[in-house]
């Protein structure tokens, strides 16, 4: 019999799918793993293994804690990198730009304060504490506590607060706007006593208060008789007084905040696995001048401890400079002269490389603790002032201090530019002012200064109602206006040779220059002449050489 007839409108019975070879999976798409995917998985596993192995070796950190600029460098498996740009924290090759961080700390207004005599029992998020009070009140309280070594608190005690801060380029940018809240050149004071002649001389140049510590135990770690930095804090809530308050901190606290800033950005610059596994630097090699005393070295170690380093090693700056140039790897005994002209100090050292141990022995040193790039900047500001006044401009009498700060920054940039170009311009603009003493010729108050290169539109029209002029600074102008400073800068060279045992200039095998101010062409020329035309080592960025040597000196 045939199949039953299909009724109209009734559903047709489904047909069985055709199966090839009788396999029920023949028509289903097969799950395939491509070779590219396999290779990607293998590569990822290999990268993970390499990253895990990368955690087994030590990455060293070296920091040049300078008077005006500081630099950090890391050494990973023999490869040294400088931490570049204190804003992004990115890494750069040795000699890269943007590595220097201004040794400047801008203190912020406290978020809270204690009443007099009140204790803060909650745990601190950081251990950055300070003492606050008016200048007069602090001096009275410190005098009172001088005879009370137990440091007991009283109802009239100053307030203890936690104060935030900004470090580096951001702080330097605020130096002109709020100089009373900005601290710099703290390295000149660290580890010294208040009665030290250098401290007393610095009192005339610093915009913040410096008072003697006679009040233990706060600020912590500050020895009795040590200088304390007082930063004006216009924050009336701190005290029941309408007078300006003063934040008091030891100099090593400034160093600690700079070191902490560099530590944080150095950790951000680490490779992916170390950065994301929460790696932190527990040890540090920090450079110090050869002439640092025991107290100054101890204060530097305290600053490193307050910055979060469990251990810190001190390395003398000229030794770090020689290591940066790889002179310690030479198989011969060598006599090296290191010339370090920084922003605030000049240090000259004669070293001898011991062939057997490949270590450097310091034979003699000399220097000038009050000669550096800042002195050249001030001399150039004087040169600029003379040129502007001869052109009919005068300085604003009501805000001369702020104008001086701006001029210093501008002339510093102009000075640095002369290391690469033959001349640089400074554009000054001012508004017309009434003539003084009945002089019918108008004068102009300078309100804008900025460095200017030749291709920077120097011939543009003046703004309406203002007069502008461009003053050109050449290398010869710099040499003539700073001739006395250049002579001072050469004097420690002969003194260091004498202190090293009357070493003859011809006995020097290598002359190494470091420090940002050693870029000055007149300095390099005079050094070469002092050693009978010998070439001066300057292939390593002088700004970063000491930090590179510090990072390379230990387990690298």
What are these regions (language model features)?
Residues 1-30:
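Short, low-complexity, Lys/Arg-enriched N-terminal segments of secretory-pathway carbohydrate enzymes
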Residues 24-201, 212-220, 241-248, 268-556:
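Oxyanion-binding/catalytic loops of NTP- or PPi-dependent enzymes
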Residues 206-240:
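Short acidic, low-complexity segments enriched in Ser/Thr/Gly/Pro
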Residues 263:
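Cofactor-binding beta-sheet edge motifs in enzyme active sites
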């Amino acid at each position: 019999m045939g199949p039953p007839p299909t009724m109209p409108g009734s559903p047709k019975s489904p047909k069985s799918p055709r199966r090839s070879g009788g396999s029920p999976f023949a028509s289903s798409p097969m799950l395939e793993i491509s070779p590219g995917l396999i290779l990607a998985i293998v590569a990822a596993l290999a990268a993970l293994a390499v990253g895990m192995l990368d955690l087994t070796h030590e990455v060293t950190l070296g920091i040049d804690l300078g008077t005006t600029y500081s630099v950090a460098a890391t050494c990973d498996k023999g490869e040294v990198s400088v931490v570049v740009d204190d804003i992004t924290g990115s890494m750069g090759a040795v000699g890269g730009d943007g590595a220097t961080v201004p040794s400047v700390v801008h203190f912020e207004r406290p978020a809270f304060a204690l009443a007099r005599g009140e204790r803060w029992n909650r745990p601190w998020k950081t251990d950055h504490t300070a003492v606050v009070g008016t200048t007069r009140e602090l001096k009275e309280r410190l005098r009172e506590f001088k005879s009370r070594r137990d440091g007991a608190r009283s109802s009239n005690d100053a307030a203890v607060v936690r104060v935030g801060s900004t470090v580096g380029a951001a702080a330097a940018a605020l130096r002109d706007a709020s100089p009373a809240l900005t601290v710099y050149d703290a390295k000149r004071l660290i580890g010294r006593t208040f009665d030290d002649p250098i401290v007393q001389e610095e009192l005339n140049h610093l915009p913040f208060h410096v008072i003697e510590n006679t009040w233990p135990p706060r600020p912590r770690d500050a020895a009795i008789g040590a200088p304390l930095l007082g930063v004006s804090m216009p924050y009336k809530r701190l005290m029941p007084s309408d007078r300006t308050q003063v934040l008091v901190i030891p100099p090593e606290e400034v160093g600690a905040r700079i070191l902490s800033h560099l530590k944080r950005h150095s950790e951000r610059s680490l490779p992916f696995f170390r950065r994301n596994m929460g790696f932190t630097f527990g040890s540090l090699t920090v450079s110090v001048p050869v002439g640092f005393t025991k107290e100054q070295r101890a204060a530097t170690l305290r600053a490193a401890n307050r910055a979060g380093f469990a251990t810190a090693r001190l390395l003398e700056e000229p030794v770090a400079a020689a290591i940066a140039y790889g002179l310690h790897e030479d198989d011969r005994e060598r006599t090296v002269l290191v010339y370090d002209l920084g922003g605030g100090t000049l240090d000259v050292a004669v070293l001898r490389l011991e062939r057997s141990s490949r270590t450097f022995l310091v034979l003699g040193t000399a220097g000038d603790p009050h000669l550096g790039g800042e002195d050249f900047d001030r001399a150039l500001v004087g040169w600029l002032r003379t040129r502007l006044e001869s052109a009919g401009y005068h300085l604003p009498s009501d805000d001369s201090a702020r104008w001086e700060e701006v001029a210093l920054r501008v002339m510093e940039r102009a000075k640095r530019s002369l290391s690469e170009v033959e001349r640089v311009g400074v554009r000054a603009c001012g508004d017309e002012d009434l003539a003084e003493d009945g002089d019918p010729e108008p004068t102009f108050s300078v309100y804008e200064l900025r460095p200017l290169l030749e291709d920077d539109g120097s011939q543009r029209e003046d703004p309406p109602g203002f007069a502008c002029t461009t003053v050109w600074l050449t290398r010869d102008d710099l040499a003539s206006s700073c001739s006395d400073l250049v002579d001072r800068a050469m004097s420690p060279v002969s003194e260091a040779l004498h202190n090293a045992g009357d070493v003859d200039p011809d006995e020097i095998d290598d002359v190494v220059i470091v420090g940002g101010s050693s870029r000055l062409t007149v300095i390099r020329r005079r050094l070469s002449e002092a050693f009978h035309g010998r070439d001066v080592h300057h292939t390593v960025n002088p700004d970063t050489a000491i930090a590179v040597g510090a990072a390379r000196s230990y387990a690298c």
